[in-house]
Amino acid sequence: MSTPARNTTLTSNTPAGAPRLPGAPAPQVLPARPEPLALHASDSALIVVDMQNAYASMGGYVDSAGFDISGAQGTIANIARTIAAARTAGMLVVFLQNGWDAAYVEAGGPGSPNWHKSNALKTMRARPELAGKFLAKGGWDYELIAEMKPQPGDIVVPKTRYSGFFNSTLDSTLRARGIRHLVFTGIATNVCVESTLRDAFHLEYFAVMLEDATHELGGAAIQKASVYNVETFFGWVSTVDDFVRSFAPATA
């Protein structure tokens, strides 16, 4: 199936969030599906989801649990380009970091669905030699990968469930800074990225996912389904090249 052509013309129907104030700069028009999205760097944030050793490094939780992360290196490079462009444009960069306390109290016990469905917890129960290794705060698995170290001005928001908005400071952090638009990257497309993006939609944020700056757990069909969900029901879908050309054309 061919990819629909991107329309880059800003019209009265282009979602643009809050009305433009007198004297405010014109928004950047990000080519996207199903229609272009008008964004200001000043009221937008780049959300980098769970770029941790657990999800993107060999020997981390996801690799140890049997998921294919061979495509993660390409995703890492694309996210790094996106972060550089966002910083050039003066856009807020927010890193989400998934995990629990070393005693796993935050993970929930048998009374929590998370205890039963988390593949990290299930893998550790099945392989006792791995107990305490996965997603424990302070451990290597929990750390952000070397290519994604936050810089001054970036924000790191810890989270304990798939959605970055659940029981976290993410919503208040964004609203305090007047953020209305969110640009999503990270791992895994169909789990924490999509969960957080769906909650963003419910909280009245305009959300766009850069499809080539995300990586799924489960195969190409899963990625395709998640992209379909986002562009059809919850937000917009664009690419790293289009984002960089829109916000940091000198580096494109």
Swiss-Prot record:
Hydrolase found in the keyword field: yes
Compositional bias of kind Low complexity: 15-27
Annotated TM spans: none
Name of the protein this chain belongs to: Ureidoacrylate amidohydrolase RutB
GO molecular function, one term: hydrolase activity, acting on carbon-nitrogen (but not peptide) bonds, in linear amides
Alphabetized UniProt keyword annotations: Hydrolase
Source species taxonomy: Bacteria, Pseudomonadati, Pseudomonadota, Betaproteobacteria, Burkholderiales
Function: Hydrolyzes ureidoacrylate to form aminoacrylate and carbamate. The carbamate hydrolyzes spontaneously, thereby releasing one of the nitrogen atoms of the pyrimidine ring as ammonia and one of its carbon atoms as CO2.
